[in-house]
A protein has these predicted regions:
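Flexible beta-alpha connector loops of hexameric P-loop NTPases
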Residues: 41-44, 249-257, 306-318, 381-388, ...
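Conserved helicase motor
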Residues: 227-232, 249-262, 284-290, 415-416, ...
Length: 722
């Protein structure tokens, strides 16, 4: 349970983890009293505390840092406020007959009283707002009834969680191939705690999930259904709600702190009241692994390959898939990893190491063919002058044909904004962020209410107005690179009658923005949807005939050993949005490298070919799954202090780990938010004692942080970086 304790001059909230039984003999240790016990019952379960401890050990952080990530802020800060609704009820002892005699001279008071009587609910009354709006009378009339002691106001706490009031429908029956996969999963669970379901896009994996969920709920178990992006919960929530009703709860960061507290408490209370039908199925993003489950029967990790499952900033830098697998062992529950494009590590564990079971769904539902994938050589198109801005002539013509057929189009560009940066056409100056060593991105539509073009840093959020001319030489600006905003403008020029929507971080900042865009496209209120990677993930639209990737090369040209894997996954996933119902879909990929091996695997939807290519490279160059990686980030606002700390740490680690320790790495963005950055990478053999390696690493980190010349250096180890 939570306690309030003094820490220096502050008061902080903590959770009692253990009782110390042995006496303290060290006189230098000062015992300070607990100021207050904040709870009468435990706020976390023993299962959660076990998980927090495992995460802190594995990801090299403190349990306090895990707690801060795990609990809604309203619980930690004790600032949760219940939502109250005012109801009107009879004043004690008042009867209808008595009330009539008190309002005979006022027709308005009598009218409101009549409405109250007609809509009165025993032991509850009627909501104040409903009484005013329903009767058509003013608040002053209601105040008169209160002043006459006819009615009284009763404030009642109500949930912010809106119950489902629609019709519950049965799940669809599985077809033969789905039924076979369902049975294979059940058999695999007899030997493996974790099973990988490798099913091509639109093969019906979600239907299999639903039947597995039903089986667990029938046994009184809880199910955690993880998705990598909040956007994915939108369509999926509607689908699951129609089957599971109020057993389904959704949990992610777009909810307010108070809403998250209420969901957390509902799940915790379902432990106390196991007969309740609420909070049995939890659909959520990665932070859902921290909820207070007690009787987990199944964890589903959908799109298990997605890097969004990894916490990239702050601490703990956990991976929800790894946490889910560990939870499966602790709770003795099944874990199902599902995807059309498995991570190399997961496929290796299933296909070669047999640590996981492996079940394959190789065909789409209802016999629909996988989309045909065509490449367009941009070098040839530019040479022939067959381009309109960033659209090749063949792509423009194909979009026109699809729109004329009444079908829809998805365009993918994994860069938001209008232009990547602006550059002086005379002196070559590029405007950079004042806080970071990175160029500013031009936005034209995000700040439309400002009426000016804006330059924004996508790292720290710094924004400034675009100057009319170069501040150095007065030259004109040229716009370099293109993002989703520019594509949107070009589409309006090419297809002035088309209804175009844009899905990126800028258009989906509001709580319901994802839902609104998805609904508009699903209801065919939009013809073309332009988007970043949000459009690649799990969305299911009936009428999409064509998907186009405007520049696939940017996915491949990154300094990341996973770049080919990630490019294949992203392109195969976005291709999977085409032709999900009825006729076969089509995918057009614009590239300057049409002969790249990734496009060869992609054109055949050959994941296994890509895997075999990648796994050989990984083994040769000492990367996962054969080696474990720990990326150490060092930060300091003083570059000299940072250099001293990074040099000392690298020397100590090299003494301990030898060539497993890299030289100091200067990142492409070497200063972020006014802090200078350096990296050191550790490669540890898969067969080595990784926990001992972590202990040696932390000893070196603590030593460096104790050196006077290195004080203030923030050192963050990232275990299994993405």
């Amino acid at each position: 349970m939570r306690v309030l304790v003094p820490l220096g001059k502050k008061q902080v909230t903590g959770i009692v983890y253990r009782h110390r039984t042995e006496p303290i003999t060290n006189d230098s240790i000062q015992i300070r009293p607990i100021l207050a016990i904040l709870d009468t019952t435990p706020i976390v379960t023993p299962h959660q505390l076990w998980l927090w401890e495992w995460i802190s050990r594995y990801y090299l952080c403190t349990m306090g840092e895990v707690m801060a990530a795990a609990l809604p802020s309203g619980i930690i800060d004790d600032n949760y406020k219940a939502r109250t609704v005012t109801y009107m009820d009879w004043e004690q002892g008042m009867t209808y007959e008595q009330a009539q005699t008190l309002v005979l001279r006022s027709k308005k008071q009598l009218a409101m009283l009549q409405y109250f009587v007609e809509h009165y609910l025993p032991n509850k009354g009627i909501e104040r707002r409903e009484l005013i709006e329903g009767s058509g009378e003013s608040p002053a009339i209601l105040r008169a009834l209160v002043d006459k002691h006819i009615l009284q106001e009763v404030k009642t706490s109500v949930s912010r969680l809106i119950p489902y009031q629609g019709t519950i429908k049965p799940a669809f029956a599985l077809n033969d191939k789905q039924q076979r996969a369902y049975q294979q999963i059940q058999l695999s669970w007899q030997q493996h705690n974790t099973v990988l379901l490798h099913g091509v896009t639109s093969s019906g994996k979600t239907e299999i999930y639903i039947h597995l969920i039903q089986e667990q709920l029938a046994q009184g178990k809880q199910v955690l259904y993880l998705v990598p992006e909040i956007a994915l919960t939108t369509q999926l929530t509607e689908r699951l709600r129609r089957i599971f009703g109020n057993q389904l709860y959704v949990y992610h960061s777009r909810f307010s702190s108070d809403e998250r507290v209420e969901i957390y408490n509902e799940i915790k209370n379902s432990i106390v009241e196991p007969q309740t039908q609420k909070a049995k199925l939890i659909l959520g993003a990665r932070s859902s692994v921290f909820l207070p489950f007690q009787s987990l029967g199944l964890i589903i990790v959908d799109e298990e390959h997605d890097s969004s499952y990894k916490q990239q900033d702050g601490t703990p830098r956990y991976h929800a898939r790894s946490v889910a697998i560990m939870m499966g062992h602790h709770y003795h529950c099944h874990v199902l990893l599902g995807t059309a494009t498995p991570s190399i590590e997961s496929y290796y564990n299933a296909y070669q190491e047999h640590k996981y079971g492996l079940v394959t769904l190789a065909e789409r539902h209802a016999g629909i063919q996988l989309p045909a994938i065509h490449g367009i050589d941009l070098k040839r198109q530019y040479h022939r002058k067959e381009m309109y801005d960033h659209f090749s002539d063949p792509l423009v013509e194909r979009i026109r044909e699809v729109l004329e057929q009444g079908k829809q189009v998805i365009l993918f560009r994994n860069r938001r904004g209008y232009s990547s940066y602006i550059q002086c056409s005379k002196c070559g100056q590029v405007l950079k962020c004042v806080n970071c060593d990175v160029s500013l991105t031009l936005h034209k539509h995000r700040f439309i209410q400002v009426g000016e073009e804006q330059l924004t840093c996508h790292y720290c959020g710094h924004t400034q107005t675009k100057p009319s001319h170069c501040p150095t030489c007065g030259g004109e600006w040229k716009e370099v690179g293109f993002g989703t905003e520019r594509i949107e403008d070009e589409l309006y020029s090419l297809f002035p009658k088309a209804r175009v929507g844009r899905m990126d971080l800028d258009t989906t900042r509001n709580k319901n923005a994802h839902q609104d865009l998805i609904n508009q496209f699903a209801q065919h209120q939009l013809d073309i949807l332009v988007g970043t990677q949000m459009v690649t993930k799990g969305l299911d639209f009936d009428n999409v005939s064509l998907v186009a990737v405007l520049n696939a090369d940017s996915l491949l040209n990154t300094p990341d050993f996973r770049s080919y894997e990630k490019a294949f996954q992203m392109l195969e996933q976005v291709a999977g949005r085409a032709g999900r119902r009825g006729e076969r879909g089509e995918v057009i990929i614009q590239t300057f490298m049409p002969d790249h091996p990734v496009f060869g695997f992609l054109s055949q939807h050959d994941y296994v070919g890509l895997y075999q290519h990648e796994i050989a490279e990984r083994e040769l160059f000492h990367y996962p799954p054969f080696y474990r990686l720990i990326d150490i980030t060092l930060k300091h606002r003083n570059n000299d202090r940072l250099l001293a700390a990074s040099t000392l740490l690298q020397e100590r680690l090299h003494q301990v780990f030898g060539d497993r320790c890299s030289p100091i790495i200067v990142p492409s963005v070497a200063r972020m938010n006014n802090a200078y950055l350096r990296h050191i990478l550790l490669r540890i053999e898969g067969y080595a004692d990784i926990q001992r390696a972590k202990e040696l690493l932390m000893e070196s980190i603590h030593y460096v942080q104790s050196i006077r010349n290195c004080l203030g250096t923030i050192i963050i180890p990232d275990v299994d970086p993405m």
